[in-house]
């Protein structure tokens, strides 16, 4: 036997699991593209001056089992205290049926944002249910399909209030003093770049202030008080002031809807509908507004439309508001939202239904009443008479109370002067309440839960009668049917079957990096050591998190060539925003606050100009040459014209045109020459890792899409993570946090996300990926991603010309197929090809980005040659079908492409088409068939007849 023990131990086994093509397949593809080896191919494609001489030092690979054991040991350093801190975060009970069938199910978590509605009807229905929950609980007319968190939703509400305000000269935004501190933090950060003045005061004093365009109120207040704002809102409305309310979703089950009180905008966190705290996230925010403001709303909105056969179908509505179309004029820079978490909250509401939710809310409130009655009976004073689940208890010996709490492994809110805060939740039991009595009163309190229960059951006055909800909620059948586990399991499976995710087929979306989300990477996110921590718990209780985050940050520093990494941004768009703010504050620190011009190539992703606008910058577009590269002559001219006002350039590398631009270092030098900074968008980092790095290239700051390059799943449209890497001179200007001091960060800047480490509970996914791949595997992943893209490009080039190539006719990790000549010849469009691919069992590539009339394909390293060939064969078969149209065999108005996709019911319907049923639904011998449930959507109908709440069950049948 010639193998050594080290070889038999095979610590790099996961590399072969993650990378799709085996060694033999890789060699076949290398032969097809005319390269001798992966290193030779990389050497041909990547400019010599930016190739790393040595790989980043992130360690050797580990097996799945070794990495899990190592991370488990780290996680065990976290202390699982019972947290009553509140402040927008509570413990939950995630129903096991949802845990197993959604959160742990790749059919849900590996799907992409539903831009292709025909393959997304399941999660679109779940999101429509989420919108219905939002509408019922807020009492408003229009709801979005989730935002990133409550604090960023507050910032979006402020921006929206200004957009819709009739008080055009007013420039002040009022925030009630009992709004959660992290919310105020994020609002202040956003207001600064928009030039708004934020006024913080008692809500009842709002009328003392002038020039207010909008008001933010909290229901329930951060220390627990329920407010009856009916009269105040009425007065504010009479003065044309836009009113936003941050609301507790569980409290809204019992309380009067803010919309009924006159609020214009209502938002909040849906976390306590089944989503673990996870040390701060990810969590979905809900957001609702009056119908008249619908076109000013941020984020995705799911609407009811019709398909080509006239059947009810769902789609993302009014996309013309969004960044990928409106760019710097968009309502928001939001791209990824929190779809997976919104769907968990949605299904939590479906499973419990209105009766179950009321039982949970009433139980929480009853236990709070019992706790309040016992404390008052023993002489303690409550700061607020009206409350739902949170008590603000005045204590003489605060230090003693906190010491007893710590000894009992309990966290109380401790930042209130001369008082402690206690927030109960759905996990709270009568035993927990007895333990709280002991902490606050001593062991010999003599209180009895049943006796107190009898007292408060007949005489509870903690919710004002006027604030009790008097209307029914969740009356739609979907919330009143699936309450047994069997029914719920089948309902969730029926939704899953409607969608196309990575567990069924390759998703070749360009600029999206739909790679493997390995099971070993996903396992740790549901460990209670990670899932149950409150984001504001004492740091000594989160030593495991701190170690894991620090180690991940260190790896990312080495992989990016930067000096520091900030983990706070909880999406790629938030990362862009945070990075641009760092640049802005850096210039201000040098008395160069006038630098506000951001250069952006014409090919840029839509979030770039939208983020620049949010950061208070002016966007100046730089032209691209005929080869799709940044036009250096135009860049120099624009930089010189900007002069002392140049703030930065935002550039993606490899470019969004799918090539490694040879002049990238020269681009950086030109911008630096004029005093600007270089923001290198990390969207295409999957073609850099181990080969080059942004810092080595010459950039100053980048965001990293951990949900692309570093294996966090897309979740059907979120969660994402967008940490930023910065050079040392920008490190003092990354986001900070008003509640938690971030260890190792000297920044004094405001927050961009509610939690200090963003969506911390999904960071273990990226930790596991890097740990299992090691330096060797990470570089190989980038190389195979490049190989796979070039293999597709070379095989499809004759049928679908590749629009842009780099040196030696190569592409980077993705390629753009130019459909425009075919469309001109035949009338068949990129849309027709995209929809026809569904019949072949594939999600479409990215359509018309970054160039209209094209398809951008990114296969990633995780797809095997077998799957690549299946996709290539499908594309070539479609090209043959287009030739049939061109030859007149099939008319342009009636052929398999323009009628695609085809659904099962067509097999048994009358058939009058000039092609067979077999050609329609089993083209080119497709065997493993994915069946879409709707035909092509009517986008125009959907936007002209906007309807964004649940439709009758009969419409789905």
Swiss-Prot record:
Catalyses which reaction(s): N(6)-[(R)-lipoyl]-L-lysyl-[glycine-cleavage complex H protein] + glycine + H(+) = N(6)-[(R)-S(8)-aminomethyldihydrolipoyl]-L-lysyl-[glycine-cleavage complex H protein] + CO2
Positions carrying N6-(pyridoxal phosphate)lysine: 708
GO BP: glycine decarboxylation via glycine cleavage system
UniProtKB keywords: Oxidoreductase, Pyridoxal phosphate
TM annotation in the entry: none
EC number: 1.4.4.2
Subunit structure: The glycine cleavage system is composed of four proteins: P, T, L and H.
UniProt xrefs under NCBIfam families: gcvP, PRK04366.1
Protein family per UniProt: Belongs to the GcvP family.
Protein name per Swiss-Prot or TrEMBL: Glycine dehydrogenase (decarboxylating)
Annotated organism of origin: Escherichia coli O157:H7
This protein's encoding gene: gcvP
